[in-house]
Amino acid sequence: MIVIESIDHIGITVSNLDRSIEFYRELFDFEVVEKMSNAREAFIKVGEVMIGLFEIEGYANQQGSKNHISLFIDEEDFDDAVDELRENDITIVFGPENLRGGKSVVFLDPDGNQLELCYPRMNI
């Protein structure tokens, strides 16, 4: 058995690295911790989680996938966050809906990658 201590990072494909960095920084204040000079990729950080943004020119996201990144948000901030998504004309594909005793909203980044804001945390 291979023993995994934790997830190191999550990687997503983007068609325009600079646009994606701006999206994640402006909307969520994610910190850019590394931007490769010899490749079109960068790592952003939220809490203890790293997300790798990997540019592939001409990338077209496959629609209909359930792949997503779920981001925990405090209950008292949820409605304001949904308002901010709407104010920024960000495409909402699901919700906001009641889910697991809380709420969830799923929306798209500029490349159609699905992101979810939700509460409460999953109990595992």
Specify the residue positions occupied by each region the protein language model found.
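A short beta-turn/loop motif at secondary-structure boundaries
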Residues: M36, A60-N61, E97-R100
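Mid-chain, well-packed structural core segment of small domains
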Residues: S70-D83, I90
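Short beta-strand micro-motifs in enzyme catalytic cores
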Residues: R40-A42, N67, G101-V105
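Short hydrophobic/aromatic beta-strand micro-patches
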Residues: T13, S70-D74, L108
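Core segments of cupin and vicinal oxygen chelate
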Residues: T13-I51
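Vicinal oxygen chelate
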Residues: V3, V82-D83, E87-I124
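A generic structural signal for short beta-strands and their flanking turns/coil linkers
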Residues: D8, R40, V49, S65-I69, ...
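N-terminal beta-strand motif that seeds the catalytic metal site of vicinal oxygen chelate
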Residues: M1-D18, I69, N123-I124
